[in-house]
Curated annotation (Swiss-Prot):
Molecular function GO terms recorded: DNA binding
Residue numbers spanned by region Leucine repeat I (LRI): 219-276
Span of the annotated motif VHIID: 326-330
Assembly and binders: Homodimer.
Family annotation (PROSITE patterns): GRAS (PS50985)
Name under which the protein is recorded: SCARECROW-LIKE protein 7
Cellular-component GO terms for this entry: nucleus
């Protein structure tokens, strides 16, 4: 079966578009009236890790836009208006001659054979050692970059996923028998009624200081969850009884509140059991293909990664507008999909193509203990794509452990304009002390970058008490689950897999036992403190960057409950129903 290519983060899809547009120009020059050629099964890369899946019910989702001529030809530069380079939108008042564009991949674009792609993904040349992951997840962790995610946006860090197991106690047998008996596929009866609009944010949810202390007493079920979380810390037997009752009021096939509650019950059980339930089938009976398709489905349904990469790339593009040599240090690269759109923008900028573009890639933790093969495959894909754009491009894998990195590892040349990218990766270094994050930031500062881009999840789950962490996580993930409903129906198997394999695992990491394996995140105020204490000052995002982020939400027909909020000193936040989800900023 062939899947329609609908993802502008997909290098193969962009390559098809690039070649098709070049051919259109040649046909126009020759005044040819032959029908536009379509490229079927084109794959200029030796390994294509970016899948496309069947389109969701909304035809405008993913990276495709409706209409064959939605945007101008990215290879046709107009006069220099003096405006910042950026995405060129045909429906904006001012055109920008060089920058990012939304190509149309929903029209008569290329198709490719999904079986052939799956073989190359699962049996390709970038396998890594992820022995500290559950065995069923090994292949997935080696190929976890989708759409324009730098890595799994809801990935549980490999170093934090598993907990050593001791022989099961009587308490854990009770919990396992009472709470973890998942219904078989035959027992699941999805609701047939259409999904309802997510309820508005409760009136009495408040934010106190920088730690987002949230009151969730408006809903009896949410209140019961908070009370159960209190019991988990002191009265375990009562907590177990409470969890048994809560299990009756939640469902992985219900409304967003019921579904998020289902995974919070599981997370609380893991905490009560002190890691002894890690072998439950919900956490290990998965295949790499299931993970792969889940990431693709999430990226098609929600704008998380599109927003983060679009905004960061725009800041880099503006900071390097007239640079002839550009060097990007990418902390936490997986498969480099973020850079496809940037390379295309640099190839068409009004100031002309750069003389050289170089990316130094520091592997993300998700690549495991031996990331060399994955980085090599990433570099080869980007090199092949740069050749299509006629760009002089270099990729340098950085295999030095992050704690040992110094300025000499990057060979920064005096005539290079340097950009440093931290995209949904620094949170992996968070701990009870900020030492690891500060070390990475100060090392980046020593490189004297022109611009530093930072993208992080907007929720405080680090140095706060367990109850506050629980409340913050409940509010955050309730919003995430609600955001899936407009484009994923209640009976959608894609939605079930996204929540079970991606979000449920992350919730478990947040609520589970404390220690180095626990998932940690911080809000923008804490990131501001960390950035400023490391010597960085904020750089305001341009009006154009903010405008194009708004147009991104509009053009892809996402729910009107998505919103953008710009706040001091220079943050741009994507929110769902007024609950912040992701924040992007730039620094120098």
């Amino acid at each position: 079966m062939a899947y329609m290519c609908a993802d502008s983060g997909n290098l193969m899809a962009i390559a098809q578009q690039v070649i098709k547009q070049k051919q259109q120009q040649e046909q126009q020059q020759q005044q040819s009236h032959h029908p536009q050629q379509q490229f079927l099964g084109l794959n200029p890369f030796s390994l294509n890790p970016w899948p496309s899946t069947t389109m969701s019910a909304n035809p405008n989702l993913g990276y495709g836009l409706s209409g064959p001529a939605a945007f101008s030809d990215p290879f046709q530069s107009g006069p220099d208006t003096g405006d910042p380079p950026g995405f060129s939108f045909s429906n904006m008042e001012h055109q920008h001659s060089g920058g990012f564009r939304f190509p149309d991949f929903t029209g008569a674009g290329g198709e490719f054979d999904s079986d052939e792609w799956m073989d190359s993904l699962m049996n390709g040349g970038d396998s890594t050692d992820s022995s500290n992951l559950p065995s069923g997840c090994d292949a997935w962790q080696n190929n976890a970059d989708f759409g324009i995610y730098p890595s799994d946006p809801f990935n549980t860090s490999p170093s934090r996923l598993t907990v050593g197991c001791s022989p099961p106690s009587d308490l854990n047998r009770v919990i396992s028998d009472s709470l973890w008996a998942d219904p078989s596929p035959q027992e699941i009866k999805p609701k047939t009624s259409p999904p309802q609009q997510p309820p508005p944010t409760a009136k009495n949810e408040v934010v106190v200081g920088s730690k987002e202390v949230v009151e969730l007493s408006s809903s009896p079920v949410l209140k019961a969850f908070v009370e159960c979380a209190q019991l988990v810390e002191s009265k375990v037997d009562q907590a177990v009884k409470s969890l048994i009752k809560l299990k009756e009021s939640v469902s992985e096939n219900g409304d967003p509140g019921e579904r998020v509650g289902f995974y919070f019950v599981q997370g609380l059980c893991r905490r009560v059991a002190v890691g002894e339930l890690d072998d439950l089938k919900n956490f290990h009976q998965t295949t790499s293909e299931e993970f792969t398709l889940s990431y693709k489905a999430l990226n098609d349904a929600c704008p998380y990664s599109k927003f983060a990469h679009l905004t960061a790339n725009q800041a880099i593009l503006e900071a390097t507008e007239k640079a002839s040599k550009i060097h990007i240090v990418d902390f936490g690269i997986v498969q480099g999909i973020q850079w496809a759109a940037l390379l295309q923008a640099l190839a068409t900028r009004s100031a002309g193509k750069p003389v050289r573009i170089r990316i130094s890639g520091i592997p993300a933790p998700v690549l495991g203990k031996n990331p060399a093969a994955s980085l090599l495959a990433t570099g080869n894909r980007l090199l092949d794509f740069a050749k299509l754009l006629d760009l002089n491009f270099e990729f340098e894998p950085i295999l030095t452990p992050i704690q040992e990195l110094n300025e000499s590892c990057f060979r920064v040349e005096p005539d290079e304009v340097l950009a440093v990218n931290f995209m949904l990766q620094l949170y992996n270094l968070l701990g009870e002390t900020p030492g690891a994050v500060e070390t990475a930031l100060k090392m980046a500062k020593s490189l004297n970058p022109r611009i530093v881009t930072l993208g992080e999840y907007e929720v405080s789950l680090n140095r706060v008490g367990y109850l506050t962490r629980f409340k913050n996580a409940l509010r955050y993930y309730t919003a995430v689950f609600e955001s899936l409903d407009p484009n994923m129906s209640r009976d959608s198997q894609e939605r079930l897999q996204v929540e079970r394999l991606l979000l449920g695992r992350r919730i478990s990491g947040v609520l589970g036992p404390d220690g180095i394996r626990r998932e940690r995140m911080e809000n923008k105020e804490q990131w501001r403190v960390l950035m400023e204490s490391s010597g960085f000052e904020s750089v305001s995002l341009s009006h154009y960057a903010m405008s194009q982020a708004k147009i991104l939400l509009w053009n892809y027909n996402y729910s009107t409950l998505y919103s953008l909020d710009d706040s001091q000193p220079a943050f741009l936040t994507l929110a769902w129903n007024e609950v912040p989800l992701l924040t992007v900023s730039s620094w120098r």
